[in-house]
Amino acid sequence: MDKQKKGIVEKPVFECGKGIAIQGYEGSFHQVAARNIYGKAVEVIPCATFRDLIRIASDKNASSGAIMAIENSIAGSILPNYNLLQKSKLKVVAEVYLSISQNLLVNPGVKLEDIKEVHSHPMAILQCLEYLEQYNWKLVETEDTALSAKMVHQHRSKHAAAIASKLAAELFELDVLAPSIQTMKNNFTRFLVLQREKEAIDIPMANKSSIYFQTNHSKGILAKVLTVIADAGINLSKLQSMPIPGSNFKYGFYADLEFEQRAQLDQVMEGIESLTNSVKVFGIYQSGKIVKG
């Protein structure tokens, strides 16, 4: 793991005076990620959908930006979010890799033998199925892990539990009856920190960039683009193809580029100009570190 992933580099300071848009409810993993970037006191603006998140983040009167999940180490890329980002005027200024820990939460005093049903998002239930199948519990799917925790708290039920974050337990005064019940312990979600283009700060010691490009799809053209990247000594840490809306099975490409010197990135951008129809730089930032969820 490099120094950036260990968190040794200087950490930029991001302004959050108007609040930070997140997808989901308070107590969600988006809020956990926001706290790791902005601090525990950060005010979050819950959004029902990622489209709402982009809209709120783009409004200077509504927020100071957003935290948005972009991929998971098990489920893969959240493809619609790449399209939302491409159409927006937001910039990526940071990233964080959150270790996802799913926990069984109950009202104070509730024991395992009291539980009759467990509420959570379908993905969280699926991630914890090996643990849950040990018990004859009814599994209730909901729209959000944190919302499940909130409902268990509000109903004061002795027979209901929720699967959610430890932050949700803290916010809704629930006990963590069983921590880290997910089957796969190495489960990470990558979150992007977004700011409006005109307000995006220059990142000291930046060593990563996210870009999108389209080629003319002639024979070998993608290989030529990748050769330019390799010749500059840049590590291509991600390459994701996406259909171009309205085209006849033509694709654009999202790429994450890791570099040591900014001149390497400049060399790539100059080198691929003649090989691409369009290029958009989503942001230039520091490679993120792994933090506990």
Named regions from a protein language model:
Residues 1-293:
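Domain-level signature for soluble enzymes in the chorismate/prephenate branch of the shikimate pathway
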